[in-house]
Structures are given as C-alpha cells and as structure tokens.
C-alpha cells in the first residue's frame, strides 16, 4: 500500500523485520506514531537497521521497543513524546532530529542488573533534541573522540552520561548541552568512562549553552 501507517493504540509487532522495514523505507512511506507501540522481533546476533521516516504526533506519547544491537537511521519529526525501550546490551541511533520538537525518553531494560547503552554510531549533533534517560541507561558515543551536541539531558538516578569510544583508553569526549533552552534535571552521573565501562577511561567535558536551567544532582566524577 502507498499511504502512511498511523499507529494510535496497541502494539504493531513485526516478526518479519527485514520485509517490514523495506515496506516502510524503500518507498519513503511514513510511520505516524500517535499513541501506540511499535515492536520488532529479535533473534540473537540479528543486527537490524530501521530507516523508515517516523512522525510523532503532537500531544501523544508513543513507544518503540527496539531490538538489541539495532540501529535507528530514521528521520524523526513531530512534536509528540517518543520512548525508546532498549533491551540489553545496546542500541545505536544515527537519526536526524532536526524537525523533532518533542522529548525522546530512553528506557534501558537490563538483564541481571547490567546497564544498557544508548549511543550514536559516530557523535550526536542534535542541538534541539531533549533526551530523558530512565532505567539503567548509559548515553555515549561509539567513535573514539566525539564532540556531541544535545538540546537538553534529564535523567533518573541510575542513569549515566559517559564518554566515547568502545574500548579505547585516553579518549576525548565533549558534551554541549542546552540548545533547546529548556529546564532539565539530571539525577544520574556524568563520568570519564568509555562506553565499555570503567575499565577504560578518558576525558569527558561539559559545555552548558542556552537560556534554560540544567540541574545536576548526581555525584559526578568527570
């Protein structure tokens, strides 16, 4: 079919992920998230990439249940709120948020007490994007040295804003935060860890911009 897919409630589950993604993406068909949940089946070592356009309808809250080790390359637009539910171990986001004015919530759902990585394949450049970290989510960049720009960052206790690099000691990672001019509170911890964890450390730097208030309540160690 040639029109958009509008999801207003319930869950739309794709078991044949490859064909479903092609149906949305190959012809530029758009998925309009307007209150429902989009879910993708996952098999071990199944590295999925989703690139179909996504519009998040104004005044709605919608959810995407992401597959582990997947990559989101969609153009995201709209004014609603979108939640990404990420299972152990990680999920990559390499999307354009230039036309998105809502809030992106990232909910890490760990297994056996572990944390979940939410990261860009290279570095973040989303000066309007407001990100809220929930669950046990780490936010970082996969490339070794990264200059990240994010509109705003909030988060629960137990979340982390880390540095960059998968497994390189001595990385340099900067976070420029505040371009959305919104008031945000981050209860998590900002540290010098690489995305692999405390076994590899580098230098994480913070630059606050914009007119909003950014409250940091955690025991930050960067």
Explain the meaning of each model-derived region.
Residues 18-21, 44-45, 91-93, 144-146, ...:
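Acidic Ser/Thr/Pro-rich low-complexity disordered segments
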Residues 1-27, 58-130, 157-222:
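Extracellular repeat-rich scaffold modules on cell surfaces
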Residues 35, 42, 68, 86, ...:
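Trimeric beta-solenoid/beta-helix "fiber body" segments of extracellular/virion adhesins
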Residues 38-48, 54-58, 142, 146, ...:
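Self-maturation zones of extracellular/virion spikes and adhesins
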Residues 38, 61-62, 137:
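Hydrophobic residues embedded in beta-strands of well-ordered beta-sheets
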Residues 1, 17, 26-38, 42-54, ...:
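N-terminal extracellular ligand-recognition/capping segment immediately after the signal peptide
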Residues 51, 72-73, 150:
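Hydrophobic residues on conserved beta-strands that form the core of alpha/beta folds
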